[in-house]
Amino acid sequence: MSERMTPIPFKQLMTWIKEEHDNFGTVFGVNAPYVKKNGKTLPLFKEKLETPFGPAAGPNTQLAQNIVAAYYAGARFFELKTVQKMDGDDLAACINRPCIWTKDEGYNCEWSTELYVPQAFDEYVKAWFAIRIISRLYGLGAEDGFMFNASVGYDLAGIKTPKMDKFIEGIRDASNTPIFRECMEVGCELFPELDGYIRATPSRICDGVTVSTLHGCPPNEIEAIASYLITEKHLNTFVKCNPTILGYEFARSRLDSMGYDYIAFDDRHFREDLQYKDAVPMFHRLKELAEKNGLEFGLKLSNTFPVDVKANELPSEEMYMSGRALYPLTIEMANRFANEFKGALRISYSGGADFFNIKQLFEAGIWPITMATTILKPGGYGRMVQLGNLLDGCEFKPFAGVDYEAVARLSEEAPTNFHYIKPIKEAPDRKMGKGKELPLIDCFRAPCKSGCPFGQDVPEYIELCGKGLFLEALQVITAKNPLPFITGTICAHHCMDKCMRNHYECPVNIRGTKLQAAEGAFEELLAITEMSREGEKVAIIGGGPAGLAAAYHAQKHGLQATVFEKRETLGGIVRNVIPGFRIGDDAIDNDIALIKKTGAEFVMGKEAPDVKELKAMGFDYIVLACGAEKKGRLDIEGNVMNVIDFLYAFKNGGELKLGRNVAVVGGGNTAMDAARAAKRAEGVEKVTLVYRRNRRYMPADLEELELAIEDGVEFMELASPVKQANGKLVCNKMKLGDKDASGRRVPVETGETVEVDADTVIAAVGEKVDLDLLGRYGIAADAYKKGNKKYGDVYVVGDASRGPATVADAIADAKWVIEDITGREIVADIPEEAKPDKEEALLRKMKLQMPGKCEADRCINCNTVCESCVSVCPNRANVAIAVPGKEMRQILHVDYMCNECGNCAHFCPYTDGRPYKDKFTLFANEKDFEDSENNGFMVVCTKCPKVKVRLGGAVKEYILDGKTGLGDLEDLMLTVIKEHGYLLG
């Protein structure tokens, strides 16, 4: 595969647009258009805009199809990708691949156009014509309701070179260029009904330009470039500023305060780049110069921010930051300049602009607004439809100045705004897990289901809840999960970690929706649950979540379950240890009532018989769900209490004399429970959680950590306990070293000590499996292996198998055991109503939406339609193809449109999924085919039809006659040839 893109000829481009739109209702994969209906426009220079936003100079404005896709979705201001004297092969050779990283904030290591300058010019002219044609053809808006803005750099000498001068003259008047004439003639040929309209296409492509300079460019050079463009080329001019103008101390402090302390940069660029004291008088001069020449001058805020590569984000030493981490810097730049000029200086904005701030920016008088990172995430260009509809509700009026007081408020609010703050902990891996390779066909999967240890059918029950079918939803849930109240309240919800909505704003509230279903239909489900006492007998030792789940599944699948619980109550750790402020007894009782209704029997209040006795009693299988009850120890001197003992006493009314100051040692969820409980204990004034690493590396779930902070728990990070005495806990002071195998940085002693007030120390350092107890059931200590669940006809599940784990893990183990005993997979019966409307699912993927009453409105139904790789590709190189006989559209990668930016790989739910390398690929010709290792094909003859195919490294030619043995791949290739011929050129 080559990273070089091949521009699409104008005739093919327009044929593609027309056939795709007419046959499938989409344009370059954008599933719905923005249509301008209210007629409102904004004047800019001598032109007008139907919307004040569009794609920033970058990957989304490099090729004609990118620009057209953005227009179709609602963009009307296009900052074209920067052109400079270095171009084509010379520039492409300097760009390491992949070159885009947008998992959260954005990074890139690519800069100006990878095309040759004349090619770039051609792309912009093709897009100019294409937009005018489709605006009229499909009634999307006025033919003059959009504008292009060229971006040029990086020094005056380069801008004055013949090829750059030709480019600039071309955008001023393209009428005599070959591409302009070609587009006009081809357009008239393809759309004769628009002949006069097409021939009236304006030849002035751009009325304005944005100056982009490299870091370290001297002020006099910047001024010389802008002056030249104003006085010699008579172009309205924006000058792009770097965030380094804020100063190192401010940038470091603001980013650190928002959780971006891991972003590495020194003060080099801050010292070498344009300084604020030099910028202000220069911008005054340039503003006056533009006005003198009857033009406008403004600032483009801001350029991307140079930072160091520290975690192998990209294969380079330095990269450029964008997205939500850039917003707090760029809005402060806007604040300073708006205040300096009292709002009189126009600001073109691009620095983390998205759905959550664009309205405020626009209403503050900051426009045009361009963006890159948000449209490189799932939803892609389609996100702009929502932006257009949002801003349609705003007042459109000529620029009368920036509301600098409003901008000051935006900057002041940015450091505490939820949308821009980095969470305390590193984001969990959003991928589905190891061992799941991206297939060539039928790749759509729901990552949430993969994130659930027992494979809960999440999208299905969410869809049912959205339709008010709570009983059906609860039946889907309990087919695999018999503890809907417990898991609907305290589940660690790793499904939500995987939710694709994380790439939009925040995950679907899957756990809350489960509880909604449980509360909405529990009585109905209980009434129709049948009792059974048939089949082989299963003895279950332990009445916690694992034992309860095993009993339920045994009863539902033809077995007889008897649970032996040594306590008088069921529920295990959830009942006896997890504090009541996290889960009430009613929730636990409901789940137990459901399990009892199945006919499971319970023997309470005494130790379970050993293996011999159980066998003598006629039990065929034994399931050990006895937890991990061997207490963990913190090996230090002093007043130290085990966390389970403490939580048990706290929940069950035991006497606690903790003193005024409590230290909890540990960083997991149990430690958070203990700290929050201690805050509520009588006589306790201060609780400090002590951990040897920092918060970012605590194993606790983010939610539990945040709740502890909300409750007023204090934190002593980088501290390892040594001893407790005289009301103090003495700790070794630690520092973080290199990362270990888990990805967490290893704590290293510094040789210093620190103290914290502590009358009592609660040790939350992990419980262990009681091997002596397992020995009573025939599992010798040397035979026990952590994670192993089967020892002959004795099974070990939950914490007894894994060590301390989650309720969901316990349910997963229980489900697996019953599947192993019965030899049948436990699956849910999915009703037809659980299947969403595919078109609605596609439209949901285009919208950002915070949680609300009905989470079904936010679920994007990845089990039905994924297509993330289609939406995030700036070049439209991943195409969704409807193949006859296949329920869902298949993904075809188009080689000649791809530059290996790698963006699609970040959002493919498969762990190592790289659609640009792993999906079946269409090649334009023999050379491209040979230059790649991708599985894929090239068309040798469309009439035969004959193709050349590579699969697993083997190359072979086929006549597609139904006898190739290629199955679904043959159907895909035939569909491309017969129904998508525009892809072939």
What are these regions (language model features)?
Residues 1-227, 232:
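N-terminal capping/small domains of soluble enzymes
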Residues 39-47, 519-538, 645-659, 849-850:
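A short, basic/flexible loop-to-alpha-helix module at the beginning of a structural domain
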Residues 76-86, 243, 360-387:
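Glycine-rich phosphate-binding active-site loops on the catalytic face of alpha/beta enzymes
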Residues 65-69, 353-369:
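Catalytic cores of alpha/beta
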Residues 456-466, 474, 503, 507-511, ...:
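Beta1-alpha1 glycine-rich phosphate/pyrophosphate-binding loop at the start
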Residues 23-38, 247-343, 378-396, 637-638:
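Glycine/Thr-rich beta-alpha phosphate-binding loop at enzyme active sites
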